[in-house]
């Protein structure tokens, strides 16, 4: 961490502790806003600049129709979910218990409907090892054979078949390397999807993601969205 970032971190920590930064904070994208409680410097930073996620949220807002069902897979503390709830009914998936608690608190403040679900979506149901970030808002939790935590996984298709969640129209996936397993577990659900955006992490070939989305009859593109990471976007073309 650079000296500048250390100073900024200390400044925000002091502001949080002294009440100079008040909770809730407001985050806004394209005129759509939501309020978020903040309990750490990391959450202040995440809400203040959305960690470079503005373009992702903007796309979700542009593509979602009123009252669509949006799956936010890898929701973290709920920035995307809460802002997008102004247009869509959001089902927010977050397996980390600490982060899930923060997601739930923010969902209660959301301007629209956000249903928090403490599941890790995958290709099948079961238990897997999971390595949480030491700080809830960091968003660097990941599946790992050496993980210190066990989480429950379930496939998206199984959730739909059980009636617990409706089929999605819009999907956002940000799962730190588990992207392919998430998509393999929702091959049926993808048939109803009009728009999906998948953030690509280390170890995942974006071409493998485009292949799965193409099988669901979605047209695909790989883009950067002004970020270092690749994103795969899938859209259903109107006949």
Swiss-Prot record:
One of its GO terms (molecular function) is methyltransferase activity. GO terms for cellular component: cytoplasm. Disruption phenotype: Mutants exhibit defective or limited motility. GO terms for biological process: methylation; S-layer organization. It is an enzyme of class 2 (transferase). Its EC number is 2.1.1.-. Disulfide bonds: none annotated. Its main location: cytoplasm. The keyword Transferase applies. It comes from the Archaea. SUPFAM superfamilies: S-adenosyl-L-methionine-dependent methyltransferases (SSF53335). Keywords: Cytoplasm, Methyltransferase, Transferase. Belongs to the FkbM methyltransferase family. This is Hexuronic acid methyltransferase AglP. The lineage of its organism: Archaea, Methanobacteriati, Methanobacteriota, Stenosarchaea group, Halobacteria. The gene is aglP.
């Amino acid at each position: 961490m650079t000296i500048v970032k250390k100073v900024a971190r200390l400044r925000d920590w002091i502001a949080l502790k002294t009440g100079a930064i008040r909770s809730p904070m407001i985050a806004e994208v394209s005129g759509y806003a939501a309020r978020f409680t903040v309990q750490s410097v990391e959450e202040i930073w995440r809400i203040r600049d959305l960690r470079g996620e503005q373009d992702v949220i903007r796309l979700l807002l542009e593509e979602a129709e009123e009252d669509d069902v949006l799956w936010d897979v890898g929701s973290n503390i709920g920035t995307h979910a809460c802002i997008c709830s102004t247009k869509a009914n959001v089902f927010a998936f977050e397996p980390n218990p600490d982060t899930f608690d923060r997601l739930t608190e923010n969902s209660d403040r959301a301007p629209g409907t956000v249903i928090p679900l403490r599941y890790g979506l995958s290709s099948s149901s079961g238990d897997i090892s999971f390595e949480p970030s030491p700080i809830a808002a960091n968003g660097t939790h990941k599946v790992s054979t050496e993980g210190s935590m066990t989480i429950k996984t379930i496939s998206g298709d199984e959730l739909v078949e059980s009636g617990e969640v409706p089929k999605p129209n819009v999907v956002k996936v940000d799962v730190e390397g588990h992207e392919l397993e998430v998509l393999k577990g929702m091959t049926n659900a993808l048939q109803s999807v009009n728009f999906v955006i998948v953030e690509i992490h280390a170890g995942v070939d974006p071409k493998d993601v485009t292949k799965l989305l193409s099988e669901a009859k979605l047209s695909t593109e790989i883009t950067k969205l002004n970020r270092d990471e690749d994103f795969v976007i899938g859209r259903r073309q109107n006949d």
